[in-house]
């Protein structure tokens, strides 16, 4: 993660996996990621399907599907965030990776897309795929008015007040394969953007949302 928020009551600093070199490296590699590029990445050790349940149990996620795991992890208080694995939301799957490099991919529900947004006042960081275990936004526990509209049909999908999680993000389950017009209002300031939920490389993490 490149974002650092010093001072202020809205940010409580945290360093993932302090004193554990392998876990720190894991957080750096799979944290709030930038857009995927052409550089080849090391091949992870993919957990066999028949062992996925055991792997999830080791991570404290026994019996959970992708949606349940995402909803649980994104809402955790910062001090309860796991330090022995990372969880990255990609357009069609949740990627879980432990400190040894073992990885399991849990498919997202058919036709659904998880979009994480972190509106900010004056501090942010770059992000493309949302990390449920390492990403931090500036505003924690903030009341934000959120509107999400299907740009293709004009249908209003979300129009309500929401509280940012302890990680500073708002989580939205929206339809896959559409374009969204998004608006966030906080203390008289507004941030707007357009996002796509189509394709295999679309962003699941929105952090360029300055409130003005």
Label every model-predicted segment.
Residues 178-187:
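A short, solvent-exposed beta-strand micro-motif common in secreted/extracellular proteins
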Residues 153-167:
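Short, acidic Ser/Thr/Gly-rich low-complexity loop/linker segments typical of extracellular
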Residues 27-31:
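C-terminal motif of bacterial Sec signal peptides marking the signal peptidase cleavage site
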Residues 3-20:
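Bacterial N-terminal signal peptides that target proteins for export
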Residues 107-157:
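Mid-length scaffold segments of soluble, non-membrane domains
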Residues 33-36:
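Bacterial signal peptide processing site
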Residues 163-172, 182:
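Glycine-centered loop-to-beta-strand initiation motif
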Residues 104-108, 113-120, 198-212:
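Extracellular beta-sheet/turn segments enriched in Thr/Pro/Gly and aliphatic residues
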């Amino acid at each position: 993660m490149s974002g650092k928020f010093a001072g202020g009551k809205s940010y409580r600093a945290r360093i993932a996996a302090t004193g554990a070199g392998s876990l720190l490296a894991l957080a750096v590699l799979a944290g709030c990621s930038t857009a995927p590029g052409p550089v080849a990445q090391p091949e992870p050790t993919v957990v066999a399907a028949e062992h996925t349940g055991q792997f999830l149990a080791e991570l404290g996620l026994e019996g959970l599907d992708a949606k349940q795991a995402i909803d649980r992890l994104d809402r955790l208080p910062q001090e309860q965030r796991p330090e022995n694995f990372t969880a990255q939301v990609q357009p069609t799957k949740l990627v879980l990776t432990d400190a040894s490099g073992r990885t399991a991919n849990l498919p997202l529900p058919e036709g659904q897309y998880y979009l994480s947004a972190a509106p900010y006042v004056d501090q942010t960081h770059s992000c493309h795929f949302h990390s449920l275990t390492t990403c931090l936004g500036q505003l924690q526990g903030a009341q934000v008015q959120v509107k999400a509209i299907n740009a293709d049909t004009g249908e209003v999908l979300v129009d309500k007040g929401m509280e940012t999680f302890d990680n500073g993000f708002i989580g939205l389950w929206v339809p896959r394969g559409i374009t969204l017009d998004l608006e966030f209002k906080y203390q008289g300031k507004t941030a707007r953007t357009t996002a796509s939920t189509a394709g295999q490389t679309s962003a699941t993490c929105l952090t360029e949302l300055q409130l003005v």
